[in-house]
Amino acid sequence: EKEISSWKYRIPFQTRSFHGLEASWMLNNATGFRKIYIAAGYTDLRRGIDGLASIVKFNFQLDPYEKDILFLFCGSDRIKGLIWEGDRFLLLYKRLELGSFSWPRTKEEALEITPEQYQALMQGLEIVSRHPIQEVHPKDLL
């Protein structure tokens, strides 16, 4: 307890965690999430929790209050994650000093990705190919 001007107050300090994982661990691993969505296209990362939650709800028609769902928004060298914990939102932010994220810049939509795709994204790899290899049928070759 500290005393200032005869008022007593306590400042509780608690590390925010999600399922026992620290916030910095969360953006490096995809564990603990039921689903992961990325916002393809461009997002204004000056937006805070309310602005990002409104993108999820109104642009993508998804529920930002669905528990254990990670929504990702990306700039070239920074990424924000939004998670509803059941009683509050948690906003995660990561900025790279060197390099950039290889983010799908297709039309503005929410893409559900796998934990493996998430790991690739965090390593700077492209997860949505611009020119995917197409299946060839033998009858088309002759």
Residue spans for each PLM region:
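Polybasic/polar functional segments that serve as interface/processing modules
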Residues: 2-142
